[in-house]
């Protein structure tokens, strides 16, 4: 439930207005002309003034008892439902829910176009129009910040960094040696552009390799809290457009992540590996260095990838194998344990 301390409810709104706004609704009844919706809530908490949604069928049982006035459901949903709840069938119910949240709520916190007095901004830095530079932010020489960008308290933007338009940089982020596109969101505590983990060992002494590469981040990228992205040694570290990177992810030097890929929390990608376009790496996946992961590969959570993966494959386990082989291995292991003498 959204707290009024942090979010402003823009309702109430007529159900007809909601359906017109969503656009992608493909089927709905014609008996809702006078229905007014005050809020969005989960099925278990919704009242007769609320709308809800169903995207995961694990929760379909709550449709029988929900008090929601209406519920957005998947295109082909035909489950049992409270007869007083209007079902609105959408092509993608979760996407419709996301649009609906934007329609009903706005953050109370605002960012006026100003540079706070405690911020330190180099004379040679270029700050675009309508930007907010928060308390104790440091922006070094020759930085370029695009229009309509927000940089929150305590963040550090190192010399020569280029940050595109409409960026949102949350608190205590540090960015060095980076060129970043438009509409990028970087959450609290992320670190971008630091030295990679590159050492040569000579006579028992580890020597740091000087890194001359940078980090290049495309447009419409989200980077989660406390994620670290190292700059390359010779080749750049590259995050292409539309990638979503969760919290606590480590991306090594010289890694390339293809367009639209999703990286879940606590993934570690060792240096010089390439992740293809529209891949999905589950939580705590480990990718060894110098590997090539093809386009549209899916890797199950906690898998360890030690060899190249062809495009379109689904893998799991450690070492990662084809998902069906992993399931077979798990079944055989259970059978062996049962047969083992006590």
From Swiss-Prot:
Pfam families for the chain: Hexapep, Hexapep_2, LpxD
One example of a Gene Ontology biological process annotation: lipid A biosynthetic process
Active site: 253 (proton acceptor)
EC number: 2.3.1.191
GO CC annotation terms, alphabetical: membrane
Keywords: Acyltransferase, Lipid A biosynthesis, Lipid biosynthesis, Lipid metabolism, Repeat, Transferase
Catalyses which reaction(s): a UDP-3-O-[(3R)-3-hydroxyacyl]-alpha-D-glucosamine + a (3R)-hydroxyacyl-[ACP] = a UDP-2-N,3-O-bis[(3R)-3-hydroxyacyl]-alpha-D-glucosamine + holo-[ACP] + H(+)
SUPFAM superfamilies given in the database record: Trimeric LpxA-like enzymes
InterPro entries, per database record: Hexapep, Hexapep_transf_CS, LpxD, Trimer_LpxA-like_sf, UDP_GlcNAc_AcTrfase_non-rep
Repeat found in the keyword field: yes
Superkingdom as given in the UniProt entry: Bacteria
Any GO MF annotation of the entry: N-acyltransferase activity
Pathway listed: Bacterial outer membrane biogenesis; LPS lipid A biosynthesis
Subunit structure: Homotrimer.
Function: Catalyzes the N-acylation of UDP-3-O-acylglucosamine using 3-hydroxyacyl-ACP as the acyl donor. Is involved in the biosynthesis of lipid A, a phosphorylated glycolipid that anchors the lipopolysaccharide to the outer membrane of the cell.
Family: Belongs to the transferase hexapeptide repeat family. LpxD subfamily.
Protein name in UniProt: UDP-3-O-acylglucosamine N-acyltransferase
Lineage of the species this protein comes from: Bacteria, Pseudomonadati, Pseudomonadota, Alphaproteobacteria, Rickettsiales
Record gene name: lpxD
């Amino acid at each position: 439930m959204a707290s009024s301390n942090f979010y402003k409810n823009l309702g109430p709104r007529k159900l007809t207005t909601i359906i017109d706004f969503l656009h992608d609704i493909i089927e709905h009844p014609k008996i809702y002309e006078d229905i007014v919706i005050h809020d969005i809530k989960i099925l278990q908490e919704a009242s007769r003034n609320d709308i809800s949604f169903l995207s995961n069928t694990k929760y379909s049982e709550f449709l029988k008892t929900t008090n929601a006035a209406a519920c957005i459901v998947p295109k082909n949903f035909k489950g049992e439902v409270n007869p007083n709840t209007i079902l609105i069938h959408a092509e993608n119910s979760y996407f419709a829910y996301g649009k609906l949240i934007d329609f009903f709520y706005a953050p109370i916190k605002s960012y006026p176009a100003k540079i706070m007095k405690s911020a330190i901004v180099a004379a040679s830095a270029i700050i675009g129009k309508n930007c907010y530079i928060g308390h104790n932010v440091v922006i070094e020489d020759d930085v370029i910040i695009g229009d309509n960008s927000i940089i929150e308290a305590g963040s550090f933007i190192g010399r020569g960094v280029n940050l595109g338009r409409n960026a949102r940089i949350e608190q205590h982020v540090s960015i060095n040696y980076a060129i970043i596109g438009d509409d990028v969101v970087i959450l609290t505590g992320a670190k971008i552009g630091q030295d990679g983990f590159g050492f040569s060992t000579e006579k028992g002494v580890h020597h740091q390799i000087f890194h001359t590469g940078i980090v290049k981040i495309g447009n419409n990228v989200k980077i989660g809290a406390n994620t670290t992205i190292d700059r390359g040694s010779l080749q750049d570290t590259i995050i292409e457009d539309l990638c979503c990177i969760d919290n606590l992810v480590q991306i090594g030097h010289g890694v390339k992540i293809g367009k639209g890929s999703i990286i879940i929390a606590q993934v570690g990608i060792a240096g010089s590996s390439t992740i293809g376009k529209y891949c999905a790496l589950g939580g705590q996946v480990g990718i060894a260095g110098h590997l090539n992961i093809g386009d549209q590969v899916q890797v199950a959570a906690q898998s360890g990838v030690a060899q190249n993966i062809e495009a379109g494959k689904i893998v799991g386990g450690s070492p990662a194998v084809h998902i069906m082989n992993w399931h077979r291995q798990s079944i055989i292991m259970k059978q062996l344990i049962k047969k083992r003498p006590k």
